[in-house]
Amino acid sequence: MRRLIVISGAGFSAESGVRTFRTDESTGKALWDEYDLEEVCNIHAFRGNFYHKTHMFYNKRRAELPTVHPNLAHLRVAEWFQRYPGQVVNLTTNVDDLLERAGVPKEDTLYIHGYLKEIVVETEAGSPKQIIDVGYSEVNPDDYGWCKPNVIFFGELAPAYGKMYDILDTLTKEDMVIVVGCSNTVINFNWELFPAVKRGTKVLVVNPRINYLEQEQYDAHGVLQFRCGAVEAFSNNNFIKIVEDHLEGKTALQSKG
């Protein structure tokens, strides 16, 4: 059976208005508004002096979610998911719920770095951890013995990586992969996908900021590149035809070894 694997990153949701992290040019630090990510996205800081500040940060991010909406790219992926049952697989490094709101059930998406609407709760030291869906509500950490946003922090193990690698290891010539809006900074999907290309997997990259080195590597491997945002690519008739021809068993594109 032909499969489509969609790997999405921050650029997939950016056009919906979901803010992304930026790098401060003067300090080189990664920031989200006034927050230093080393303080609010680091497991060691969370366990130290930044427990409450981290929850304030994620409360703001959670409150932002209902103010943004799925864009055309989310809706297109959801349309394919519904039109081609069992053929479309979603892997995302995003923690928002826009794919779910577009029509892809949460359980049918692998959230590689967690899910913003959930918290992990421990009622007392050593007790089993529970995952609670808090929706868009503000969390008061003092209401729990211990709690943490169900989001993977720097310095923390990511349980979903194992399942992600299992999926990528199964790629064959029957598969097509779209990598959309991924910076390849935390996870370099190029190194995971180039071996699959040699096995015949077709790969499309959607990224307006492909650098020269990446372009050389993509060209050498026969990776088709769309140098634009997610919305533009997923509304491009040629792009849509390539994907749908693949899913329907027609000739799509050839990969080089």
Q: What are these language model-derived features?
A:
Residues 1-257:
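Conserved catalytic core of sirtuin-type NAD+-dependent deacylases
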